[in-house]
Each structure stands twice: as structure tokens, then as C-alpha cells.
Amino acid sequence: LVSDASNTKSYISRVAQDGSKSKEIYSGKPTLYLIVRTPGPVGAKIPSKVQKVLQLLRLNKINSGVFVKLTETVYPLLKLLSPYTVIXQPSLQTVRQLVQKRATVTVTHANDEEPRQVKLNDNNLVEEKLGDEGIICIEDIIHETSHLATTFKTVTHFLDPFELNKDVVGYGPLAKLRKLEKQEAEKQRKTSNSGSAPILEIDIDDFVAQQN
């Protein structure tokens, strides 16, 4: 694990430098993405470097997802994780669906011995935890996330990773085609280093709509 903020920043910087040859794919404009953890290549051991980044992003469970702001620094991290994740740009409607229907947070109250996970359905809780940032309701969280506001990191780390309940290639009328596409991508991934494996992008709006 990366032990503190200084080490985290240094580690991300090193990964970004390693992936600098691919940065031309990044348009230069910060963009909202949802990144979802997938099983990865069958029988493959996750490299320690990849495991660290998965932990940094809190993607510790298969089919868990988090919002990220794609930047020049973050892009190489996504390249590194490409054999073990899929990504997509969520619409405002999808951000709203995820936050309103699937968001949970981990909180500690005065009488609790340990932190506990609760469903995010109380504006009072939002104001209690994020009021100092000017965020007082669930709709504020949706706005700050979708607009990549200055509080984006605070807001997205307040949310637990979303727990999704379907395999990302097993839904919708094009499921068979998507499975074939993923199988082809898997072949490329197995013969590629993590940093050069293709990033698999899906229709995240359709995926989330199928779940809710």
C-alpha cells in the first residue's frame, strides 16, 4: 500500500512518466470517466504495480466502479489498469442514477465502535460531512461530480466505490458481439505489457440503465 499523500503523489508521478509516450491519446481536456473493475485475464497474476493503483482507486472488488477525472497524470494509470478494467464517459443521467440509487458512504457516529456503510439517502448526512465545502445535499454531489468541480476529489472520495451487479460484457442485445470484442481484447492484453494493452471502453449509460 502507498502509505501517505507524499508517497502517493510520487508513485503516480512515476507511473505518469512511464506512460508519457501514450499521452497523445489524451485530448488535453479533463474529462469525467467511470472506471469499473473486471476479472482480468484468466489465470494471470496481478502485478504489484497494478495492485497498488487498484488500491489507490479503491477498486478492490470485481464489478466495483469509481468516478475519475481523466487528466494527463491519470491517463497512464488507466493504461496500466487496462487488462483489469473497462471505462466509459457517463452522461449526467447516469451520474444521477448511480448516486441516487447505488451510492453508499462509510461513516462513524458517536456511538459506533467501528465505521459502517450506509446508503446515501439523507441530505442531513451530506451537509454534516461536506457542508464546509458548500455541499449540502445529494444533488450537490451530482453537480460537483458531473461538472468536475474543484471539490471533485473530496466528493468522489466521500462516496464508497459503486457495487455493480452484472458482468460488463453480459448485458443487452449486443452481448454476444461485446463478448467477442472482449475476447479479442483479452488476446491482445495477454501478449502486451499492462502499459500498452488496449483500454476497453463500453457504453456505460446502457450498462447502468440495465441495472437500475
UniProtKB/Swiss-Prot annotation:
One Pfam family hit = Ribosomal_L30
Annotated membrane-spanning segments are none
- Biological process (GO), any one: maturation of LSU-rRNA from tricistronic rRNA transcript (SSU-rRNA, 5.8S rRNA, LSU-rRNA)
Gene Ontology terms, MF aspect: RNA binding; structural constituent of ribosome
Q: What GO CC terms are in its UniProt record? A: cytosolic large ribosomal subunit; nucleolus
Q: Cite the CDD domains for this sequence.
A: Ribosomal_L7_archeal_euk
* Matching InterPro entries: Ribo_uL30_ferredoxin-like_sf, Ribosomal_uL30, Ribosomal_uL30_CS, Ribosomal_uL30_euk_arc, Ribosomal_uL30_ferredoxin-like
What are the UniProt keywords, alphabetically? Nucleus, Ribosome biogenesis, RNA-binding
Any keyword Nucleus?
Answer: yes
Q: What is its main location?
A: nucleus
Q: Where in the cell is it found?
A: Nucleus, Nucleolus
The protein's matches in Gene3D superfamilies, at most eight in alphabetical order, are given as:
Ribosomal protein L30, ferredoxin-like fold domain (3.30.1390.20)
In terms of superkingdom, the source organism counts as Eukaryota
- Belongs to which family? Belongs to the universal ribosomal protein uL30 family.
Main function: Involved in the biogenesis of the 60S ribosomal subunit. May act as a specificity factor that binds precursor rRNAs and tethers the enzymes that carry out the early 5' to 3' exonucleolytic reactions that generate the mature rRNAs.
Protein name (Swiss-Prot/TrEMBL): Ribosome biogenesis protein RLP7
The encoding gene is RLP7
